[in-house]
Curated annotation (Swiss-Prot):
An annotated Gene Ontology molecular function: glucuronate isomerase activity
Record's protein name: Uronate isomerase
Biological process according to GO: D-galacturonate catabolic process; D-glucuronate catabolic process
Keywords attached to this entry: Isomerase
Catalytic activity: D-glucuronate = D-fructuronate; aldehydo-D-galacturonate = keto-D-tagaturonate
Record family assignment: Belongs to the metallo-dependent hydrolases superfamily. Uronate isomerase family.
Enzyme Commission identifier(s): 5.3.1.12
Pathway(s) served: Carbohydrate metabolism; pentose and glucuronate interconversion
Record bears the keyword Zinc: no
Pfam families recorded: UxaC
Length: 467
């Protein structure tokens, strides 16, 4: 049988092969949004077995296993690591058509030199081989990053985080990869969360002030933003179920915050007013510091109440939202632009039905001397498969200038997920190669190769000012 993963994987014509192998393949990786643990990088975590490395916290895999009816004990429960790996291996063949199938075999091939298909027959051979390698030098958290040619990553961090692990990494001259924090203040934006007031109290503690009113909350946020800035942070990230926008004055925001603090229920309008004012305050602060603002919009979180109570958040029970989007997004960006305080912004939509809304909106807010100031963020989460990536690139190209795109990110908690950059690069090269093949683009490898390199590396390097 011909190897499943070979040099031509996903490259369906000679033009795609030239673009990938001559222009994209060897570029370093800038992974500007991920969920890796800075502590695990600082400590250069070693993994006892493949279940620790591969299945711990990977809700993509968990969802696939549940879809096949696998008992929860083999997913997040009491089964042994070997039993959990076996359950995943039995699942893999049935993931055909899902990116998990490609990612699984790319990861085995690139990091463990495993060329066989993972399934019920091969699981023990793969388990033993990979676990043996994990005990050797060169198979730690940092080693996987180095082997992947990673240059720079952005983690996702709560405002309460002391960032000590990031500082340890920065001070370690033996490790050249830059690991920088991103400011993720969702717990402050979501004023109707049951835990909101408790979180605000903790925020005040780390910001060295008592948060008794809305003005003090804004000061606490500013204190933490500046703390993050001193630790090397240059990005913020916001996860929003929908895009809020409702005009709000400072006095109104103060009243709404006080109402929540006194235990009264807030209306949807009050919630949106608070969110709008607070997001605008933060965005202006980001602008003043030269940060990039990321908006991840459109996920419904923790939809299965029974399983949320059993397992908590980020365990595979989230999905795509639908909502009123175009007007609030444009109003929010316009408000900041009108005041001359719109930071570089990346807008991600989880719902691909809104691709054209985002792709057209970003063109409304250009800036002289800045290439692609407002970006249509990479195909995300339920869209980071071949069809989703192609749809995103085509939609961006159709109504914008896709050569300005800042490229792929892993959005992952796994140290093996850097193969997603290879996956993305192959898809980009195959897409452009198909345009050449169909006569829709010239066979100008030097020019198109430069566009490939920009999308895969250089645009991000420039956008995040990494030079």
């Amino acid at each position: 049988m011909q190897p499943f993963i070979d040099d031509r994987f996903l490259l369906q014509n000679k033009h795609a092969e030239v673009l990938y192998h001559d222009y994209a393949k060897s570029l370093p990786i800038i992974d500007y949004h991920c969920h890796l643990s800075a502590k695990e990088i600082a400590e250069d975590r070693r993994f006892h077995d493949m279940t620790e490395l591969w299945l711990e916290g990977d809700h993509y895999k968990w969802r696939a296993m549940r879809a096949l009816g696998v008992e929860e004990k083999y997913i997040t429960g009491s089964a042994s690591p070997e039993e959990k790996f076996q359950a995943w291996a039995k699942t893999v063949p049935y993931c055909i058509g899902n990116p998990l199938y490609h990612w699984t075999h790319l990861e085995l091939k690139r990091y463990f030199q495993v060329g066989v298909l993972l399934n019920e027959q091969t699981w023990k051979e793969v388990w033993d081989h990979c676990n043996e390698l994990l005990q050797q030098e060169g198979y730690s958290a940092r080693s996987f990053m180095i082997q992947s040619n990673v240059e720079w990553i952005g983690t996702t961090d709560d405002p309460l985080d002391d960032l000590m692990d990031h500082q340890k990494i920065a001070q370690d001259s033996s490790f050249s990869i830059k690991v920088v924090p991103s400011f993720r203040p969702d717990a402050v934006i979501e004023i109707n969360r049951p835990s909101f007031l408790d979180y605000v109290s903790k925020l005040g503690e780390v910001a060295d002030l008592s948060v008794d009113d809305y003005g003090q909350l804004l000061q606490a946020l500013e204190n933490r933003v500046r703390y993050f800035h001193e630790a090397g942070c240059r990005m913020a990230d916001h996860g929003l179920e929908s895009m809020p926008y409702a005009e709000c004055t400072l006095d109104e925001a103060r009243v709404i915050f006080q109402k929540r603090k006194e235990g009264f229920a807030l209306s949807r309008e009050e919630e949106e007013k608070y969110q709008t004012f607070t997001l605008c305050f933060l965005a202006r602060l980001y602008y003043s510091l030269g940060w990039v603002m990321q908006l991840h919009i459109g996920s419904i979180r923790n939809t299965n109440q029974k399983m949320f109570q059993q397992l908590g958040p980020n365990t595979g029970y989230d999905s795509i939202n639908d909502f009123f989007f175009a007007q609030p997004l444009n109003a929010f960006l316009n408000r900041l632009e009108r005041d001359g305080q719109l930071p570089k912004t990346i807008v991600y939509t989880l719902n691909p039905a809104y691709n054209y809304i985002v792709a057209s909106t970003i063109g409304n807010f250009p800036s002289e001397g800045v290439k692609g100031k407002v970006q249509f963020g990479a195909a995300w989460w339920f869209n980071d498969h071949q069809d989703g990536i192609i749809r995103h690139l085509n939609d961006l190209a159709n109504v914008g200038v896709f050569s300005t795109f800042v490229g792929m990110l892993t959005d992952s908690r796994s140290f093996l997920s850097y193969v997603r950059h290879e996956y993305f690069r192959r898809i980009v090269c195959n897409l452009i190669g198909s345009w050449i093949e169909k006569g829709e683009a010239p066979q100008d490898y030097a020019f198109l190769g430069k566009i490939v390199q920009d999308i895969c590396y250089f645009n991000a390097k420039q956008y995040f000012d990494l030079s």
